[in-house]
């Protein structure tokens, strides 16, 4: 049966995706592999391997206007995930009977034959974030975050090219054209949250892959222990005794949040998930991935400095998340990347919204003196309460839920409302 695995990257991660491809071919030589590049090369690109495809040139189902709209209103992660069902459609159009998506920061340790077998009798295969029933949850990644972001992790997704698989892809395409934001206030989280619908829509046509050895990742390290047998095969078991013990072969690991440039230097360091515990048994997989990146330094370095095409206006000014969401609220149809009189760039510039300081990555984890700032905000809200009184203060807080979304602040640049 003709099968294809693929990933989606901005062009700076082509090298990381090639390392994923190497791991796939080592363990699964009969499975084809593709890399869909979400952005473009502004100049003549270096010679690209045949497996690398420029998405804008090959994907169907989106007009030029829709592509531009999505490329601007979504940030890099949102955009790469938003085109995922269109990539599935492209793979199916090329005649493949089964398609597997893997995030570029995944490394495959053994055969994916069990996934292929699952799709023999199902239309879709997904991996949950966590597979054990933990009455007393001890994971560092909070349960509420998985409730918000989705029960399944879309670092992996397998779909069969049958009637139900194609229907899911079409359904997914329609929603991700406009609803692939990471916006908790409206229950959206990229392409991933939509998969919570699959048990209801597909019922027994969905295969939930509960193997401990699939999509092993930082958010489930707390429940899974790594071990290696005398033959060198890596296995995964439950770390605690609150679930019936299992012994599953390690298939693939999702190295999400690792600092890949540091890995290239031989340094294992993670950038996401606060207070993540270091488990000694993880050294086996961490060192394997580190060694793979070190061995492919030239591959990794070939594209890593390439800028994200859709990260700036045509004059080089950076596009912030606030710009993207504000544009989305205006429902404009002209090219938002353009600069000059009468453009979106001109409108936000006149309101002082063009700054070089990087504010998108500022959070409570990296901002200085967070406790002092929280105390200052508490004093500010205390003053508001005294000025407004109980009733108006409560109603004001309710309004903040509405106005926490940048789309609701179009009045800042919309002359008719200002």
How would you label these PLM feature ranges?
Residues 1-418:
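Glycosyltransferase catalytic domains, chiefly GT-A lineage
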């Amino acid at each position: 049966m003709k099968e294809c695995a693929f990933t989606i990257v901005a062009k700076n991660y082509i090298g990381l995706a090639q390392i994923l491809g190497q791991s796939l071919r080592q363990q699964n030589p009969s499975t084809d592999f593709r890399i869909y590049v979400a952005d473009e090369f502004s100049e003549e690109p270096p010679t690209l391997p045949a497996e690398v495809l420029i998405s804008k040139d090959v994907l169907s189902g989106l007009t030029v206007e829709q592509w531009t709209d999505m490329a601007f209103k979504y940030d890099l992660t949102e955009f790469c995930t938003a085109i995922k069902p269109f990539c599935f459609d492209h793979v199916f159009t090329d005649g493949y009977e089964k398609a597997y998506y893997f995030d570029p920061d995944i490394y495959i340790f053994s055969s994916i034959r069990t996934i292929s077998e699952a799709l023999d009798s199902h239309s879709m295969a997904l991996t949950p974030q966590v597979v054990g029933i933990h009455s007393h949850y001890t994971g560092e990644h909070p349960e509420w975050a998985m409730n918000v972001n989705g029960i399944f992790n879309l670092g992996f997704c397998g779909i069969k090219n049958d009637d139900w698989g194609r229907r899911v892809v079409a359904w997914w395409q329609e929603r991700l054209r406009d609803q692939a934001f990471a916006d908790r206030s409206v229950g959206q989280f990229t392409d991933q949250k939509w998969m919570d619908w699959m048990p209801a829509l597909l019922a027994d046509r969905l295969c939930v892959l509960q193997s401990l050895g699939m999509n092993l990742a930082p958010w489930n390290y707390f429940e899974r222990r790594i071990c290696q047998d005398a033959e060198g095969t890596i296995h995964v078991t439950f770390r605690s005794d609150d679930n019936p013990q299992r012994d599953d072969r390690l298939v693939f690991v999702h190295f999400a949040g690792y600092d890949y440039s540091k890995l290239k230097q031989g340094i294992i360091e993670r950038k996401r998930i606060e207070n993540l515990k270091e488990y000694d048994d993880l050294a086996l997989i961490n060192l394997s991935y580190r060694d793979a990146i070190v061995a492919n330094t030239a591959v990794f370095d070939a594209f890593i400095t390439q800028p994200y095409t859709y990260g700036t206006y045509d004059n080089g000014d950076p596009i912030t998340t606030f710009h993207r969401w504000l544009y989305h609220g205006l429902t404009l149809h002209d090219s938002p990347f353009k600069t000059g009189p009468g453009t979106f760039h001109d409108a936000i510039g006149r309101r002082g919204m063009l700054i070089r300081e990087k504010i998108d990555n500022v959070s409570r984890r990296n901002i200085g003196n967070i406790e002092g700032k929280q105390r200052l905000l508490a004093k500010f809200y205390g003053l508001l309460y005294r000025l407004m009184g109980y009733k108006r203060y409560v109603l004001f807080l309710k309004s903040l839920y509405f106005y926490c979304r940048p789309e609701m602040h179009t009045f800042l640049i919309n002359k008719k409302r200002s």
